[in-house]
């Protein structure tokens, strides 16, 4: 078989072997030497990091103020319950976020099937265990389920509104990806006299909310869309330049009252026109000690409170104050 130098082989044999409803092996051959690893690695990374899905992002459990708690009559502690909630395989039809409720009394096992669902919400693994209840135990909770992509830690979803949310609303790190495991191997393939070709075998397992075949299609589509820009390297004729302020940590925009300092320390800071945490961290210890009525005890208190938030005195902020922070805001702080 004669092939032009500029001509590349494309897979002519594609086989999909369904190992189980959630697992499949996809075989593609032949591929030019080296393309097995090139395509296999790219698809694997997309499948693991970029597939959209749904996950529990927040839980509110009756009688629980923080995750380091235990519930009377419940075998698992709160951390174990939150970990079990991460194992739920959920599908949302038509909505990006929904709040679900669960209420059950013991004795017995609490499973995903005990969650009260809306008409457009589906839980694939209804037998998934959430907790075990004793005779005197009960579990009541509200779950916020959201749509997302890949993995997203709870800190990444923090906003100004979250600072004022009620105590007891527990944020979860969310793994939205419906793909549980991906592995690939590259084997030798042969076409007539050519023996230096690749055969790509992808072993893919999902959580049941997405068919393995469909997962491969979506990953390939994402890769195709990203590579399309390289086919024609002509961007917009006139690139749009967007002037943007440097991002400022939201905690620096919060008033010093949020630090919950003693009344004496707080009043001393306001007397020096220090209204925001961003104002405070730019002051040095020497400068603060010159403040009337602010002694070493108050200084130590301020340093400890800042340290608990990963901050310290004497920090430099080149873009402070931001343009969005009006001067008259300080007068009302």
Curated annotation (Swiss-Prot):
Classification via InterPro entries: DNA-dir_RNA_pol_insert (IPR011262), DNA-dir_RNA_pol_RpoA/D/Rpb3 (IPR011263), DNA-dir_RpoA (IPR011773), RBP11-like (IPR036603), RNAP_asu_C (IPR011260), RNApol_insert_sf (IPR036643)
Source organism, top-level taxon: Bacteria
Name by which UniProt lists this protein: DNA-directed RNA polymerase subunit alpha
Reactions the enzyme catalyzes: RNA(n) + a ribonucleoside 5'-triphosphate = RNA(n+1) + diphosphate
Coiled coil: none
MF annotations from Gene Ontology: DNA binding; DNA-directed RNA polymerase activity; protein dimerization activity
Family: Belongs to the RNA polymerase alpha chain family.
Swiss-Prot/TrEMBL GO biological process terms: DNA-templated transcription
Domain notes from UniProt: The N-terminal domain is essential for RNAP assembly and basal transcription, whereas the C-terminal domain is involved in interaction with transcriptional regulators and with upstream promoter elements.
Renumbered residue ranges of the record's region Alpha N-terminal domain (alpha-NTD): 1-234
Assembly and interaction partners: Homodimer. The RNAP catalytic core consists of 2 alpha, 1 beta, 1 beta' and 1 omega subunit. When a sigma factor is associated with the core the holoenzyme is formed, which can initiate transcription.
Function noted in UniProt: DNA-dependent RNA polymerase catalyzes the transcription of DNA into RNA using the four ribonucleoside triphosphates as substrates.
Region (Alpha C-terminal domain (alpha-CTD)), start-end ranges: 248-333
Keyword entries, A-Z: DNA-directed RNA polymerase, Nucleotidyltransferase, Transcription, Transferase
One GO CC term on file: DNA-directed RNA polymerase complex
């Amino acid at each position: 078989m004669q092939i032009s130098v500029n001509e590349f082989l494309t897979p002519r044999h594609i086989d999909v072997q369904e190992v189980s409803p959630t697992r499949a092996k996809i075989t593609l051959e032949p591929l030019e030497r080296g393309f097995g690893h090139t395509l296999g690695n790219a698809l694997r990374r997309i499948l693991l990091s970029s597939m959209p899905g749904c996950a529990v992002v927040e839980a509110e459990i009756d009688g629980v103020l923080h995750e380091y708690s235990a519930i009377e009559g419940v075998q698992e502690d709160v951390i174990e319950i939150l970990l079990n909630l991460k194992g739920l395989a959920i599908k949302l039809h038509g909505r990006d976020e929904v709040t679900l409720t669960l209420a059950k009394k013991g004795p017995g096992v609490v499973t995903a099937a005990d969650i009260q669902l809306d008409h457009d919400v589906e839980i694939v693994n209804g037998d998934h265990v959430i907790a075990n209840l004793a005779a005197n135990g009960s579990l009541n909770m509200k779950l916020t389920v959201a749509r997302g992509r890949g993995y997203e830690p709870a800190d990444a979803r923090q906003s100004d509104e979250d600072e004022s949310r009620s105590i007891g609303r527990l944020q979860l790190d969310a793994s939205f990806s419906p793909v549980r495991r991906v592995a690939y191997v590259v084997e030798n393939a042969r076409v007539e006299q050519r023996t230096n070709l690749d055969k790509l075998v992808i072993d893919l397992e999902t959580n049941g909310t997405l068919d393995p075949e469909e997962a491969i299609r979506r990953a390939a589509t994402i890769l195709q869309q990203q590579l399309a820009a390289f086919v024609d390297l002509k961007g917009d004729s006139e690139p749009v330049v967007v002037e943007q302020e440097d991002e400022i940590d939201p905690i620096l925009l919060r008033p010093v009252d949020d630090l919950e300092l003693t009344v004496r320390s707080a009043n001393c800071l306001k007397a020096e026109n220090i209204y925001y945490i961003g104002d405070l961290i730019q002051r040095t210890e020497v400068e603060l000690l010159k403040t009337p009525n602010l002694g070493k005890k108050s200084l130590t208190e301020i340093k400890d409170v800042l340290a608990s938030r990963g901050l310290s005195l004497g920090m430099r902020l080149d873009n402070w104050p931001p343009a969005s922070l009006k001067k008259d805001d300080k007068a009302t702080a």
